[in-house]
């Protein structure tokens, strides 16, 4: 290990808080550290929001450290109240197990789990069979309710009501860290900055029970300039699963981020050298679009592979140039019979998720924000038939400047 990975993560913009900064940096500089990041299995795919922590894991592994990807088969049964205004709906064990399996398959694309270079663990293995009384005696005794109630993750829920069910989450996550410490020698937990209180709980538990050093690091959360979490679109989350968010849509999301976020995302979400990150981030005016293209290409390449990244880039450039419609764009296919009768534009927009509702679609159409084959359409009742197809045998629907969708007949 040459350059200390702590300095690398700091320079690239990852690190927000550290429990023991100097000690953590010293530890990472002198030995191979086993660390963990938890993933609660709340969906069947990782999202763009997860990708920042996945990148951190990749950096750490490349520097010679050993990641543990902890799947939350147990904690997902409770649900993390952090950042939630209401209690999560309870998920079935079968759904959680399925989601955890999907996460494991996706993480294997980014992390090398061969030859003990990394570990996949599932906290269902130790949480679901816990003896409640023993847990309270062994773990609960180390937690002050007074102190827990001052934690940010609980404070914002107190007005609406926090169930005892959710109140246990911090103890369970702390218990995870302790189990991983005993089982694998895990000394460091990493997570998003919204996990700070939970991570502190685990660090403190190990130091109390084992009289041994344990550490926590949190990363900044990807947010827009308004402070909203990045990785969301009108269609919902930006997924890493290509069947839920196509490589083209994934590429377009990063191609269209705010100018002020380009340098930050290049540092966090690509492996480009920091000199190149700073050069691209300093571009202004129309040149910033080149930096966005590099960003979108590099992230898509990591997530979906070089071939899909090139296809997405080609499709985006084809659209921008006003050229022929590309086979790599998001596409919806209707039967030829449906086009013979005619399909109204509102239905097409709903099916393509270019609108959240019929009224939303109608509003966009009437306000002149929608075009079909580069012709603005303001009649929301207009129906399209096969004789409206362009020379490429398709309808290209655009909403605004950045949302596109192709429609074809079978």
UniProtKB/Swiss-Prot annotation:
One Pfam family recorded for the sequence: SYY_C-terminal
Gene3D superfamilies for the chain: HUPs, RNA-binding S4 domain, Tyrosyl-Transfer RNA Synthetase
Alphabetic keyword roster: Aminoacyl-tRNA synthetase, ATP-binding, Cytoplasm, Ligase, Nucleotide-binding, Protein biosynthesis, RNA-binding
Keyword set includes Acetylation: no
Entry-linked CDD domains: S4, TyrRS_core
Coiled coil (UniProt feature): none
Class of the enzyme per the UniProt entry, highest EC level: ligase
All copies of domain S4 RNA-binding, residue ranges: 343-409
Binding positions for L-tyrosine per the UniProt entry: 36, 169, 173
Gene Ontology BP terms: tyrosyl-tRNA aminoacylation
Subcellular location(s) per record: Cytoplasm
Keyword ATP-binding: yes
UniProt motif 'HIGH' region: location: 41-50
Catalytic activity: tRNA(Tyr) + L-tyrosine + ATP = L-tyrosyl-tRNA(Tyr) + AMP + diphosphate + H(+)
Molecular function GO labels: ATP binding; RNA binding; tyrosine-tRNA ligase activity
GO CC annotation terms, alphabetical: cytosol
EC number: 6.1.1.1
Stated family: Belongs to the class-I aminoacyl-tRNA synthetase family. TyrS type 1 subfamily.
Function in brief: Catalyzes the attachment of tyrosine to tRNA(Tyr) in a two-step reaction: tyrosine is first activated by ATP to form Tyr-AMP and then transferred to the acceptor end of tRNA(Tyr).
Subunit-structure text: Homodimer.
Designated name of the protein: Tyrosine--tRNA ligase
Species in which this protein is naturally found: Lachnoclostridium phytofermentans (strain ATCC 700394 / DSM 18823 / ISDg) (Clostridium phytofermentans)
């Amino acid at each position: 290990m040459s350059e200390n990975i702590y300095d690398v993560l700091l320079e690239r913009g990852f690190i927000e808080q550290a429990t023991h900064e100097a000690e953590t940096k010293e530890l990472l500089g002198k030995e191979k550290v086993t660390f963990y990041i938890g993933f609660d299995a709340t969906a069947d795919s990782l999202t763009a929001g997860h990708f920042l922590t996945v990148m951190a894991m990749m950096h750490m592994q490349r520097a010679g450290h050993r990641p543990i990807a902890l799947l939350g088969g147990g904690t997902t049964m409770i649900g993390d109240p952090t950042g939630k205004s209401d209690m999560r709906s309870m998920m079935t064990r079968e759904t959680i197990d399925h989601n955890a399996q999907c996460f494991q398959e996706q993480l294997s694309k980014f992390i090398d789990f061969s030859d003990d270079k990394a570990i996949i663990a599932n906290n269902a293995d130790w949480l679901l069979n816990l003896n409640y009384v023993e847990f309270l005696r062994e773990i609960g005794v180390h937690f002050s309710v007074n102190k827990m109630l001052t934690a940010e993750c609980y404070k914002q829920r107190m007005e609406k009501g926090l169930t005892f069910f959710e109140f246990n989450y911090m103890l369970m996550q702390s218990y995870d860290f302790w189990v991983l410490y005993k089982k694998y020698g895990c000394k460091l937990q990493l997570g998003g900055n919204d996990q700070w209180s939970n991570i502190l709980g685990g660090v403190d538990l190990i130091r109390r029970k084992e009289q041994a050093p344990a550490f926590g690091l949190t990363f900044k959360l990807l947010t827009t300039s308004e402070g909203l979490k990045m990785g969301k679109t009108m269609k919902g989350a930006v997924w890493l699963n290509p069947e839920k968010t196509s490589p083209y849509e994934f590429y377009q999301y990063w191609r269209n981020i705010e100018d002020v976020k380009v340098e930050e995302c290049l540092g966090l979400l690509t492996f480009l050298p920091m000199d190149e990150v700073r050069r691209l981030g300093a571009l202004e005016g129309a040149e910033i679009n080149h930096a966005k293209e590099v960003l979108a290409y590099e992230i898509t390449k990591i997530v979906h592979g070089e071939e899909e990244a090139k296809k997405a880039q080609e499709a985006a450039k084809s659209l921008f140039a006003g050229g022929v419609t590309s086979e790599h764009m998001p596409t919806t296919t209707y039967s030829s019979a449906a086009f013979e009768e005619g399909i109204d534009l509102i239905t097409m927009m709903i099916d393509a998720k270019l609108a959240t509702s019929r009224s939303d679609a109608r509003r966009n159409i009437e306000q002149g924000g929608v075009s079909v084959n580069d012709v603005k359409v303001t009649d929301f009742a207009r129906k399209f038939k096969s004789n409206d197809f362009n020379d490429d045998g398709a309808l290209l629907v655009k909403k605004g400047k950045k949302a596109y969708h192709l429609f074809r007949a079978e």
